[in-house]
Amino acid sequence: MQGFISQVLGPVVDVEFKDYLPQINEAIVVNYELEGKECKLVLEVAAHLGDNKVRTIAMDMTDGLVRGLTAVATGNPISVPVGEKVLGRIFNVTGDLIDEGEEINFDKHWSIHRDPPPFEEQSTKSEIFETGIKVVDLLAPYAKGGKVGLFGGAGVGKTVIIMELIHNVAFKHSGYSVFAGVGERTREGNDLYNEMKESNVLDKVALCYGQMNEPPGARNRIALTGLTMAEYFRDEMGLDVLMFIDNIFRFSQSGSEMSALLGRIPSAVGYQPTLASEMGKFQERITSTKKGSITSVQAVYVPADDLTDPAPATVFAHLDATTVLNRSIAEKGIYPAVDPLDSTSRMLDPQIIGEEHYKVARGVQSVLQKYKDLQDIIAILGMDELSEEDKLIVERARKIEKFLSQPFFVAEVFTGSPGKYISLEDTIAGFKGILEGKYDDLPENAFYMVGNIDEAIAKAETLKEVSRKDVCLDNCKVDKAKKG
């Protein structure tokens, strides 16, 4: 059905039809010429103004749009390609390829506006999603089909953790991942693409980008584009999918911009009045079904570090676990720099993870907390002033801190150490042994950047051998000096 543009107000475009009224969320296409180039703009219907006139939100820049241009209603919402063909490629909000690679004919397309799975299809089991990362699996385990908040400043290793998770899901669970770049920097999107290429994980992930320089419609709907691709892998292929959203705050922020542009009365702190329902509608689609699951890791930017801001506060209500990255841990050279005391999970419950796992996790946190409390005394008076019991706690805590580090597959290029995937059983056994004092005789350096506890024992032997050789060399030098 053909109509024409009657008004252009930045990213908001009014379209008038003669005998037709498009539905809310229907896609309208405008083809026009700008500086001698053919352009195609997709608009999404956001409001009915009466007299067959609709107000739409543009999914790209509206440069060059003029009143009177022909607009064609498609009769359907925005639909994007789905299936295995999307892996290794970069898409924009409308499902067009933007990686300058070879063109592909996609045979399957799904609408980005979908209902969540019905209750009878959803899985009621509480299962752990094993990541192979010790600190996560032990202290803040992810729920299969759950939602994880990833908190951390710039340069503490968010991207590396995301890439490692993509790697482990692909190689250990034979699963796929979808990455949605929601309103982040174009440079970061480019860096992530290149790093994934170098780390050989690109062919297991689909990338959807709606970056900072794009209109609010594109930044908001890109999250739905990525989620739709993930839903296909879950519902049609029965896979366990990992969905990354960087950054979920930008989803709320762009929704707020759209709301203001449409003239809706703002709510608290200027956010849209529908903030909670929009977030709920989106998050409800991320779930486990009897066929497969979508587990999402969502980077959360907290504006001005204010946790009570409505945007992050609305996200917190949906999270099952939080992974907090701490700069002070990264400064010690411990990677991944996950804070073992700040990170949380609703899965850390003896009825879900079992008594042994729960006791070991709480034991580790207890020792680390005591060590944290003792640090002021150590800084002022030194280790010698501590009681024997406290000295033992400090020694074990330092070993635990070191043992929480691990070499990543995707960081092999930088560290020179082969990556390690550590099963949950090995992780629990290793930390249980440290808490029980089985490894009190091993040096703390033996626990740094190793996989399971057997590797720590082997590393301790190597360190002992090296120090023995050093002592022999020193003795030989002394003997030669005496003879000389």
From Swiss-Prot:
EC number assigned by the record: 7.1.2.2
CDD domains in the record: ATP-synt_F1_beta_C (cd18110), ATP-synt_F1_beta_N (cd18115), F1-ATPase_beta_CD (cd01133)
Pfam family, one: ATP-synt_VA_C
Reactions listed under catalytic activity: ATP + H2O + 4 H(+)(in) = ADP + phosphate + 5 H(+)(out)
Top EC class for this record: translocase
Keyword Nucleus: no
Positions of ATP binding: G152, G153, A154, G155, V156, G157, K158, T159
Main location: membrane
CC per GO annotation: plasma membrane; proton-transporting ATP synthase complex
Cell compartments where the protein resides: Cell inner membrane
Highest rank taxon of the organism: Bacteria
Membrane-spanning segments: none
Gene3D superfamilies, alphabetized: 2.40.10.170, Bovine Mitochondrial F1-atpase, Atp Synthase Beta Chain, Chain D, domain 3, P-loop containing nucleotide triphosphate hydrolases
GO molecular function list: ATP binding; ATP hydrolysis activity; proton-transporting ATP synthase activity, rotational mechanism
Subunit structure: F-type ATPases have 2 components, CF(1) - the catalytic core - and CF(0) - the membrane proton channel. CF(1) has five subunits: alpha(3), beta(3), gamma(1), delta(1), epsilon(1). CF(0) has three main subunits: a(1), b(2) and c(9-12). The alpha and beta chains form an alternating ring which encloses part of the gamma chain. CF(1) is attached to CF(0) by a central stalk formed by the gamma and epsilon chains, while a peripheral stalk is formed by the delta and b chains.
Stored NCBIfam families: atpD
Membership in a protein family: Belongs to the ATPase alpha/beta chains family.
PANTHER family tied to this protein: ATP SYNTHASE (PTHR15184), ATP SYNTHASE SUBUNIT BETA, MITOCHONDRIAL (PTHR15184:SF71)
Function of the protein: Produces ATP from ADP in the presence of a proton gradient across the membrane. The catalytic sites are hosted primarily by the beta subunits.
Protein name from the UniProt record: ATP synthase subunit beta
